[in-house]
Amino acid sequence: GLSGAGRPGAGSLAAALAGHAQIGIPAFGIYGEHVQDADDTSIPEDVRTRLLDYATAGLAVAQMKGEAYLSMGSVSMGIAGSVVDPDFFGSYLGMRNEYIDMSEFTRRIEEGIYDPEEYEQAYQWIRENFKQGKDWNPPEWQYPEKHEDWWKFVTKMTIIARDLMHGNPRLAELGFEEEAGGHGAIVAGFQGQRQWTDHFPNGDVLETILNTNFDWTGIRQPSVVATENDSLNGASMLFGYLLTNTPQIFSDVRTYWSPESIEKATGWKPEGRAAAGLLDLRNSGSTTLDGAGKAVRDGENVIKPWYEFTEEDREATLEATTFHPASTGYFRGGGFSTHFRTSGEMPVTMCRINLVRGLGPVMQIAEGYTVELPDEVAFTIEERTNIEWPTTWFVPNLTGEGAFKSVYDVMNAWGANHGAISYGHIGGQLITLASMLRIPVNMHNVPAERVFRPKAWSLFGTESLEAADFRACETFGPMYR
């Protein structure tokens, strides 16, 4: 990190980096821009940023190694991301894959393989704290007589999913020693649709609670759980979580709303950040409650790490959220869906890993901001899709070029139906992490000064950095091959 004029100057760093490249080890080099005196022990801001980016991404790599992705179910509705690829998880992330059939939930519910005391505590807390909202189903699709049974069922599902991921020593005390161990899962996915949800209450409450900074036990560390068992979005959520320690928003990248379309549908002309249009990020009934943006820091709406989350944040988050009887058009077995609208203009980063046959994994990154819409405008747009689902309006930062020429171009270039949204502009750290794992980035809007990759990447070209990234990742190959 020291930029000095004395012997050997930058020579030792340059020599070391050249040697590493020559033997195929892509090392990172940190060299400050301004010359420092030899007795100056301060760390310049540019060096500090590089050190933190490297350490944060490196810790994420280390935390993933040896952990599991737990597939709870199989492929949801033919979604490609639900096809859990063990080569990707093993070769690129150093993770293993574990699998259960969704009938394991049925077995544990029917045979009482959960802590009955915790169930009573959880059920009471959920009924006292989760506000049940309007049933938006047509009258012939409404089943109010089943609601209480649905609440009991989804509470048990939530406890069981957590036990499957992390284990629960209480189960051993109850005589279920094998089940007490769990699967050592740092991330999981729940299939749900359609085989489960056509018959049983859906997994929306399960996914929502586990992804959130709190539950009936109080404020605690969230888990990472992907809707529809989309393992690639789950891995993307995991990246964001490990880099920030904040809960991740799982969303459908559902609709691009042009300013003209918004005005035509609502009579309101978009302004401010929304003037160029927006992306409607709306998941099918679940996402972290922290996505409501009701936590506050220095007067600003934020998403906090669990260890900064306060009781006031929890109360505001619950107040902003309603749980509606699930659309029985989608979910014949019933259940409940989470609804909120993300508050404030929060800086966020949306990312997604996609797999391409013959190429391998690639990553997309879009930094931008959430926006709020007037209530009547938001209501009208929500009615056009699903009013009972969690809603985040997202405006990516535009560069005027390529995939970020317009908001429409971002939507058009997005590689799949889902995205993982993290609080903060963390695109630079995602790029650093991706380079460590040899995952090329096929689109991003991160300013050049925040991009930090191994020094050897410059040996693959300096004019087109995107192309050089692909060549370098292909040459060095996955970390765990």
Where do the protein language model's features map onto the residues?
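Short beta-strand elements of ligand-binding domains
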Residues: 1-2, 188
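Cap/lid and interdomain-hinge subdomains that line or gate substrate/regulatory clefts
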Residues: 2-150
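Anaerobic metallocofactor- and corrinoid-dependent redox/one-carbon enzyme cores
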Residues: 92-93, 122, 133, 138-141, ...
